[in-house]
From Swiss-Prot:
The gene is HAK7. InterPro entries: K+_transporter, K_trans_C, K_trans_N. One of its GO terms (molecular function) is potassium ion transmembrane transporter activity. Residues 680-702 are annotated as: Disordered. Disulfide bonds: none annotated. This is Potassium transporter 7. Glycans are attached at residue 351. The chain crosses the membrane at residues 53-73, 94-114, 182-202, 218-238, 246-266, 297-317, 327-347, 367-387, 419-439, 451-471, 476-496, 504-524. GO terms for biological process: potassium ion transport. It is found in: Membrane. The lineage of its organism: Eukaryota, Viridiplantae, Streptophyta, Embryophyta, Tracheophyta. Keywords: Glycoprotein, Ion transport, Membrane, Potassium, Potassium transport, Transmembrane, Transmembrane helix, Transport. High-affinity potassium transporter. Residues 74-93, 203-217, 267-296, 348-366, 440-450, 497-503 are extracellular. Coiled coil: none annotated.
Amino acid sequence: MPSYQYLLSLLFYILDCTDRFSVIVTIHNHRVGVLMIVLLQDQWKSYCRTISLLAFQSFGVVYGDLSTSPLYVYKSAFSGRLNNYRDETTIFGLFSLIFWTLTLLPLLKYVIIVLNADDNGEGGTFALYSLLCRHAKFSLLPNQQSADEELSTYYQPGVGGIISSPLKRFLEKHRKLRTCLLLFVLFGACMVIGDGVFTPAISVLSAISGLKDPGPGGIPDGWVVFIACIVLVGLFALQHRGTHRVAFMFAPIVVVWLLSIGVIGLYNIIHWNHRIFLALSPHYVIKFFKMTGKDGWLSLGGVLLAITGTEAMFADLGHFTAASIRLAFVGAIYPCLVLQYMGQAAFLSRNMSAVEDSFYQSVPRSLFWPVFVIATLAAVVGSQSIISATFSIVKQCLSLGCFPRVKVVHTSRWIHGQIYIPEINWILMVLCLAVTLGFRDTTVIGNAYGLACIVVMFVTTWLMALVIIFVWQKNILLALLFVVAFGSIEVVYLSAAVTKVPQGGWAPIVFAFVFMLVMYVWHYGSRRKYLFDLQNKVSMKWILTLGPSLGIVRVPGIGLIYTELVTGVPSIFSHFVTNLPAFHQVLVFVCVKSVPVPFVPEDERYLIGRIGPREYRMYRCIVRYGYKDVQKDDENFENHLVMSIAKFIQMEAEEAASSGSYESSEGRMAVIHTEDTTGTGLVMRDSNNEASGTSLTRSSRSETLRSLQSIYEQESGSLSRRRRVRFEIAEEERIDPQVRDELADLLDAKEAGVTYIIGHSYVKARKNSNFLKTFAIDYAYSFLRKNCRGPAVALHIPHISLVEVGMIYYV
């Protein structure tokens, strides 16, 4: 490749906007005749405006936590035996440690390297795990298919095909290693949930602690804790309203906060000790450890708090772009934080007695109250961002089948992924209040908070190493270099944080253990239940021996049988027809499953297939969601399903005609675009209330059932808003007679009504199971199932159309 092409590639990589520019290159006789880069002025301005706007918005969502760290870093660092070293050299060395920690981890590791490891624009621990599962067979999701690999979001653009290696084959071969990888990821997720407890507690308590000594009117510690608890209760109580209504204020608050602490830091440098600039040299780090020894190492638990919130840069990548997050950090966050830490160090070098409240003591008295108000607001913003991140991480665990079913509410019509989980919100509030009231000290809370944050960073480092090997397909030595460079720093900080376990560091370990236990029990029980279904599914031979009527009465209507199986017929079907020998004229086995991608495009969400011969009128529908997709109540699901099946019938007939074989192929699945109604052979017309009523009158439902449904629809807001449509076979199209008959049966069944059938399962351990398995299944898993949301609620099934079939699973 000529050198100028390398330069162009480098330019486009840096700008991250290759689709926004026009590049004209004229080459003559293998030499550069004319090299012209025409930047379209309007597109350039639009790009700059977009990046600037996203960078501005990222202040309120991404950097609220990181920007409030100056409230408590120096106090936590001097809380131990380092308090015995009150001299300028120690202060300078401590600031040098903070500066180089900010430079090496947030700036070098995350901004320059980790932000490149996005999963279709998404970031975070699960994004890395998802990338690994798609480029190697690491996934433990039970119902994966080869058709999932055909999703447009499955493989990264620009990444080569999957290559085999001894390490890859070794990890894929040993299931225990893949289980350990999942547990490693879940452990990091549990620590993020711990952040959702400790961040609001330490941020709000640190901000309110300024009231302890604003002058002669200082208030007691008990009142500080009480006021902090009131603020925390208000913060969690307002979560159900959604943050989008006040989110426009978040970024300005953090920007004002950053400018304030930056200016105050610069003032303190000039006013107290401008020699602090010398501490930018790493030489002071060496002097610091030579002077303090083990005591200096123990103080790293406090220095660690300077980078809490760094993981949010990667975790919240999906809401912004890598370029905007980089711009915000390099242009504002990094310089303002460095100035503030430098200013506090300059102040402390002349006022060592103020170390217990160094931030507020370093603020000029005339600016105390404005800074106090801004600090409190910034603490709330930082807390809000981590609470939202906790909701997101629980949703992702739910998608992996590693968390009990909870209610996920989409709080914003415009912001995708803005969710609220009531159960998690109230659990976080109770734990946060318990931490605030129990510890009552930011230093102790900081010990717990720091341990949780460094563990999450450590998990990211090792996952990034695997991504470098298996996704980026780089040399293993490069991955080892990454681990050595950053993992060694994090191990040093982790070792210091572990020493704080008796002084509050035990809290994140306990929280992580409890959440990990819940996740593992749920995953174990759900997988055992799935394996039971897989081993006891009905054979097609048995289905075929029954004939087209299935040996039962086929009543009008469509029966949707929900199952986790993507192949075969679940045992719930045989259990139902054995006890009630009647079923609907059209059967659809529906599987709602998760795939290891962040989002599944709407036009690729549905997979439709046929079960058995054509005259059986049995179909399969697989609905696929990504780990960031929110399964909202689809008001048009039934209409989409009918159109999708109709389109599949047409596609199957066309392929059969072209191949000359009219036998249906069992197991064949096709992606159906639900928004595209062409080629279905149907016409969908809006139906008014009168027409709808006429349609119901012609149906086979009894007068009592129609009356109950009418009352239910009036009381249910979601059903009353559903679009009423009527399907007709297009007369002008030339349709094969067999296809027309099948479409007519489908429409008659739709007019008769749709019934949802799900299993009401009771999971029990086998009699010969050991004690641990019996306890896990019969007590722990059973308790979680009884106290979480039912499958009908999670799947948004209308109660008036629901039939539950009881089954006992002996696993």
